[in-house]
Amino acid sequence: MKPNQNYPQKIVASDGNVYYSIRNLAEAIHSDRTCIARDFRLKGRYEKNGVVYTLCDINDESNKVKVVTIEKERDDEDEYQEFLEAKKVTQQPFQIYKLKPWKRSRGYRYAVALFSDAHIEETVKPESVNFLNEYNIDIAEKRIKNYFVNLATCLERDEVEELIFASLGDTISGYIHAELEQTNGMSPLEATFKAQSLIYSGLRYLRLDANLPKLKKIRFVGIVGNHSRTTKKIQHSNGYKLSYEWLMYQNIKKECEITNLDIDFFIPESELAIIKTVDEKTFIFAHGFQIKSGGTGTVCGIYPALNRLVLKYSKVFKQDMLFIGHFHSSVNTPNAVVNGSIISYNAFALTNGFEYERPQQQYICYDSELGGQLLTRQIYCD
């Protein structure tokens, strides 16, 4: 067809063909007219089977580009408007928006650092876990040192003013199973003395040696785990009295008092520690053995049992967040945080098909101005 003088656009194909309307192009290449118009509006071109179709202007009669003969001419003004819109898009320049950094007003910053499931005297031979992990007393010491150094880095970076250091138990493995009596690298008492020295050294580092000018307050929460018990079964009313960890926490507290290390201690005579934060939040800390083993064997993993525990506690305590350990897996939900472990993968995890996880501990930073969590970090210990 001949070009219409009132229709000064053409579609030029990369194969040399020329089309004078979207309808003509659609009929010639058997494509949907709406799709072609949309691509012209959004991209300024249309592509099919390796051929690119581009909008151009008709200059004059001397244009020698091959014209495809189309029997049907443009019969409505709408198609002409489609050309104009598509052409307009291709000719518009980019608009540059100015971006200006701004500083958010900040409130009182406090962080919860979880410390649990170190099992420092337990032995993990690489061969027993297909070389996914190795663990012994020396590696445990190294990982705990790394934890405190990395924790100090987080506190400095986040300008934290108050630290809630929550030791959630199972720092030692103890002798609760015959297998542990045969394979542990230390007795429970030896492991307790080793663990209390490592934890005290880490707290001392945070208070005196790390460069943390913003950190004004440290609150220590000490929860006993199930591995540190001296009884065959867990005892609920007086379990703390029969735990190596409760003795360990008392020793750490006394040493801090003797050396004037400014740390507030809360060592409950209960399975739970319930504290209030500066912005009136209620936090519950527990080891996690309150969730029975059935909570990890389902398709949904720990989540159903964890949510049930959260709901049960909420009826009584109206807590904002529950923090637990025990499961050696980092889990975060809107109402609960499950800590990872320092020991990482062992033969028990392999036998039960648990997911592998690097040695890590949870760290959650809060800002009173925001009214909730500012950020969550994983503190890696390896």
Which residues does each PLM region occupy?
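Active-site neighborhood of divalent metal-dependent phosphoester bond hydrolases
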Residues: 118, 127-129, 135-137, 174-266
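Conserved beta-sheet core of the metallophosphoesterase superfamily
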Residues: 238-246, 253-262, 267-271, 279-381
